[in-house]
Amino acid sequence: MIRVGITGNTGCLGMMLAARIRGNRETNLIAFERSWFNEPEMLQHFVAHCDWIIHFAAISRDGDGERLYQTNMRLLEQLLAAVTTTQFSGVVALASTTRYAGKLPYHKSKRDGAALLLKTATENAFRSSVLLFENAFAPGGLPDYNSVVSTFCANIAAGIECKIDSDAQLTLLSAAEQMDQLMEKILAGNIPVTMTFKGAVHLSVSELKEKLEIMRTAILNKQIPRFETRFEYELYTTLRAYCAGLTD
């Protein structure tokens, strides 16, 4: 039985991964509470019962950039202190982003966090991985926060016109697909030092809007479109969650 602990298990990605771990006979989800970051003994107890630790806990937005950076670094430092104290020998995987090279404090916290994780792993003989997630979307995402997909889905479901200020190119991959790929690594017992996720789709903002509008029409007509790719299926599933009640 592979014992997996998830920090940030109440977030979109954390909840999705937790559901997969609970539903697999080969894995056991180790309970975690965010308050344990401030309780060293509880955090050590958590770490001691894990074979894998997936560290999602972080904040991605805050009006105070320095506070965001310090919070994200502090959470990782507290986790690594428990890892060191318990002589943990499993895998610690840090959730990051393909856009880690950006200039925002969030991006800096991911860069510095990755460097700290690798240094600590090298000094303490546990395995580490940095998970470079693509721009993810899923049912339950927060509009104007998690993803442009969440924002567009909420607006289109409500019949609100989506304004496009810049028809930029997007790189999207559903949270479900990324969690499936991460589960494969956990079950295989092997993960690269830096993990990227396959299957991302590239499209413009206007193309995304057009796809969602076509899907909304299908939902209102109680039709299920033919999906050419899993991306289209996951996009439809996400929009449908925002359209709940429209077809009653």
Task: Set out the residue ranges of the language-model regions.
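Short-chain dehydrogenase/reductase
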Residues: 69-70, 103-114, 142-146, 172
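NAD(P)-dependent short-chain dehydrogenase/reductase
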Residues: 118-128, 134-170, 175-187, 211
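Mid/C-terminal beta-alpha module of Rossmann-like enzyme folds, strongest
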Residues: 177, 181-248
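Conserved Rossmann-fold NAD(P)-dependent oxidoreductase catalytic core, especially the SDR/UDP-sugar
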Residues: 74-115, 119-124, 128-131
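N-terminal Rossmann NAD(P)H-binding glycine-rich loop of SDR-like oxidoreductase domains
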Residues: 2-21
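A short beta-strand-loop structural module common to alpha/beta enzyme folds
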Residues: 28-37
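NAD(P)H-binding glycine-rich loop region in Rossmannoid oxidoreductase-like domains
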Residues: 36-78, 82-85, 97-103
